[in-house]
């Protein structure tokens, strides 16, 4: 049943690897409909394993414009075999999480150094102590210096992480070229601080350096959409970009409505059309494979009841079928409410999933 569905309507695929214990489960989801077209437990997650599954999906009509995935080498190498000309955009979530982890580590280091300094000051203030002050004072001075340095590093890293998240990798941001300049600035700042913590800061800097084009690929897609909106609505491009940037502000803030009024005055009756088009363009430009993580959270309640995945192909296939044919009771995306992922993807209705399994039509409820 899962293999009979035509996948040609999928334009953006989200790929990731989830795990049950130490066993990888390869997953692929349509970014628009959340239709899960790949859910397979395998012994390996290397290039050949991914390539075999993606080639099978290609035979079923899957030819996405691009995919979104993390920096996994096996996943990306497998895609190169299946779709040599299909771009694989970077997943911004993982690099942001890695940066946030580094910030938290240095925040804990700074907090620990402060605790040591406060303990030593308490010891020095004790009138009953019986020791020389000279050694303790030297130690206290060293702790003051270490604490100041640790807090400074933590603050610097936190600032860089916020810039990366809110100014560079955010949907509501500048054009791609400007993002690249800001991205390179952050990498350069990390390089200047790398000597302070080579293993951790160095690893993050290298990851950012190697993934720049993949992580910022979404910005190129968004730029093209905004350019198309400006041409269609016949409005200056900078006003369309300003409309995009206005999405940064909460609609409960004064600055949001001030910006809203300025743009409305500049574009007149076209503003509402442009606003709706920009909102739709931003909503249809994925930057991460987080929907796979969402699928993982739904699967987890089932996976935790099993210590292994023996017979996993059939069992996971049934779960995949259930998730693809169960209708959404509610959703933030209005077009999904009351429809199943398959119905959203294909545009055609289907019977209840129990009926599709051959269990007959649903019986009316008896009062």
Located regions from the model:
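RNase H-like polynucleotidyl transferase catalytic core
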Residues: 86-103, 272-288
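Catalytic-core elements of nucleic-acid end-processing and repair enzymes
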Residues: 116, 120, 127-264, 276-280, ...
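Short amphipathic alpha-helical "interface-anchor" segments enriched in bulky aromatics
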Residues: 284-309
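A polyampholytic, Gly/Pro-enriched intrinsically disordered region
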Residues: 106-124
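C-terminal domain-tail junction helix/linker
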Residues: 155-158, 162, 166, 170, ...
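RNase H-like nuclease fold core
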Residues: 1-85, 92, 102-112, 130-141, ...
């Amino acid at each position: 049943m899962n293999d009979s569905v035509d996948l040609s309507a999928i334009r953006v695929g989200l790929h990731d690897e989830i795990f049950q214990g130490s066993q990888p489960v390869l997953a692929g989801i349509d970014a628009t409909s959340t239709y899960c077209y790949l859910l397979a437990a395998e012994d390996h997650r290397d290039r050949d394993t991914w390539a075999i599954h993606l080639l099978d999906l290609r035979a079923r009509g899957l030819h996405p414009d691009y995919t979104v995935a993390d920096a996994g080498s096996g996943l990306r190498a497998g895609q190169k075999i299946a779709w040599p000309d299909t771009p694989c955009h970077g997943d911004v979530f993982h690099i942001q999480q890695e940066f946030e982890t580094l910030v938290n580590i240095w925040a804990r280091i700074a907090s620990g150094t402060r605790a040591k300094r406060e303990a030593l000051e308490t010891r020095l203030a004790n009138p009953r102590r019986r020791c020389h002050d000279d050694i303790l004072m030297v130690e206290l001075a060293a702790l003051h210096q270490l604490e100041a340095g640790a807090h400074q590093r933590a603050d610097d890293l936190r600032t860089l992480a916020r810039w990366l998240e809110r100014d560079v990798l955010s949907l509501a941001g500048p054009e791609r070229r400007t993002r690249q300049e800001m991205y390179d600035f952050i990498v350069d700042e990390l390089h200047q601080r790398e000597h302070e913590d080579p293993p951790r800061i160095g690893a993050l800097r290298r990851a950012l350096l190697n993934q720049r084009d993949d992580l910022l690929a979404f910005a190129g897609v968004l730029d093209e959409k905004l350019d198309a909106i400006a041409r269609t609505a016949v409005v200056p491009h900078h006003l369309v970009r300003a409309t995009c940037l206005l999405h940064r502000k909460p609609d409960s803030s004064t600055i949001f409505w001030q910006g809203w009024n300025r743009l409305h005055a500049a574009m007149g009756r076209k503003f509402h059309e442009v606003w709706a088009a920009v909102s739709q363009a931003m909503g249809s430009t994925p930057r991460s494979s987080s929907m796979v993580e969402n699928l993982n959270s739904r699967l987890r309640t089932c996976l935790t009841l099993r210590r292994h995945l023996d017979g996993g192909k059939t069992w996971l296939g049934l779960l995949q079928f259930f998730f693809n044919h169960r209708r959404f009771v509610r959703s933030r995306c209005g077009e999904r409410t009351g429809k199943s992922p398959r119905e959203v993807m294909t545009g055609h209705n289907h019977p209840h999933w129990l009926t599709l399994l051959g269990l007959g039509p649903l019986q009316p409820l008896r009062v």
